[in-house]
């Protein structure tokens, strides 16, 4: 990955820590008489400029809750919070705690049980983890399926989505994180086949763990965002369900983060050429000319229709790996075709993978996604009760 990505990612999400150590550095330099020499004066000037940049970064992150709430209000209605039952609204959060975002890599939370490495298929990568309330309620819990990213070639279920999963599990949800077969050893569509296999496993087995198999939402970032969106838009598609073609793989909501949504963008000039070469060499292992159906079928943007589930698409405006323009086009196309609500939030200053660990932006985003999922669950419950 480009050096710029890592620099911008860590600076953007850990700005408060950079401010702290740079402030300490400035005090040390002043204490050693740096202001008495021109080099020290220039160095302190550079630190002041850095302070200004970091302050602007934190200000951008501070806008996150307003941007996310505006996106949800636009898609779901001004009264969307009131559509969530009062008992569930009571456990949601609008604020964030410094105790969390000042400990960015501390993931575990009280009251959450973690069950590891449960098999859902025959391959060594077909393993899943469950995060659930340590003390389970009287009813079955709604389910969230988390798909990790990593360019379809790397990644693990223990590395991503943890702030969201622990947050939801503390509030009565059951979260499932899966591993799946990776390229280049396995070419696409192995990745989506495993995702569908995991959905089928959840439908048949999650009740044993306290989850409700009737309501499954899906999320993921980057390649996981692609797979989450594709799974949500291709329910029961037999070509992605070898050996379980008749299985029900419908989902009830989706929250893809910074996903790849169109493998064959039109016009071709808008294509990310480095991404295209990577897909040809490592993921699909063929060109579009050699297998147009495979490329087209694997693009979420080519599978939008009126039957799509409610979707909350989140992307960073400064994503240097998956361009934000692709998310804009996908959100617009989905909103134009889907009968269900489509919310789209574009976060200023956010890089790729911005919500992997706790930060100001991450924790505000987790709160908003929890509201969307609770709204989706309440909507589903209302429809189910009326049937």
PLM regions with names:
Residues 1-387:
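Alpha/beta-hydrolase superfamily serine-hydrolase fold, recognizing
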């Amino acid at each position: 990955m480009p050096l710029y990505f890592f620099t911008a990612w860590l600076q953007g999400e850990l700005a408060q820590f950079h401010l702290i150590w740079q402030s300490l550095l400035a005090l040390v330099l002043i204490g050693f008489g740096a202001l008495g020499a021109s080099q020290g004066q220039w160095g302190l000037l550079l630190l002041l400029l850095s302070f200004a940049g970091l302050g602007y970064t934190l200000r951008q992150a501070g806008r996150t809750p307003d941007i996310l709430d505006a996106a949800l209000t636009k898609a779901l209605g001004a009264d969307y919070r009131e559509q969530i039952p009062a008992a569930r609204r009571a456990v949601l959060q609008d604020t964030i705690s410094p105790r969390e975002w000042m400990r960015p890599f501390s993931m575990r939370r009280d009251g959450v049980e973690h069950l590891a490495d449960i098999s859902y298929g025959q391959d060594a990568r077909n393993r899943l983890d469950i995060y659930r309330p340590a003390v389970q309620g009287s009813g079955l819990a709604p389910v969230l399926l988390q798909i990790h990213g990593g360019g379809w070639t790397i990644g693990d279920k223990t590395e991503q989505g943890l702030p969201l999963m622990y947050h939801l599990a503390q509030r009565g949800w059951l979260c499932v994180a899966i591993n799946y077969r990776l390229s280049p050893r396995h070419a696409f569509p192995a990745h989506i086949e495993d995702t569908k296999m995991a959905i089928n496993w959840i439908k048949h087995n999650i009740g044993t763990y306290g989850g409700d198999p009737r309501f499954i939402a899906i999320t993921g970032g980057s390649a996981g965002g692609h797979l989450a969106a594709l799974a949500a838009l291709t329910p029961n598609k037999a070509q992605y369900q070898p050996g379980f073609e008749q299985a029900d793989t419908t989902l009830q909501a989706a929250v893809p983060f910074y996903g790849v949504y169109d493998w064959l963008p039109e016009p071709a000039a808008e294509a990310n050429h480095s991404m295209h070469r990577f897909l040809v060499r490592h993921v699909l292992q063929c060109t579009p000319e050699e297998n147009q159906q495979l490329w087209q079928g694997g693009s979420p943007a080519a599978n939008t229709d009126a039957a799509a589930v409610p979707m909350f698409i989140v992307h960073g405006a400064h994503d240097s790996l998956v361009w934000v323009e692709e998310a804009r086009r996908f959100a617009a196309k989905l909103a134009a075709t889907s009968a269900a609500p489509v919310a789209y939030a574009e976060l200023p200053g956010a890089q790729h993978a911005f919500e992997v660990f706790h930060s100001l932006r991450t924790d505000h985003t987790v709160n908003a996604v929890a509201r969307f999922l609770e709204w989706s669950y309440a909507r589903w419950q209302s429809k189910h009760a009326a049937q």
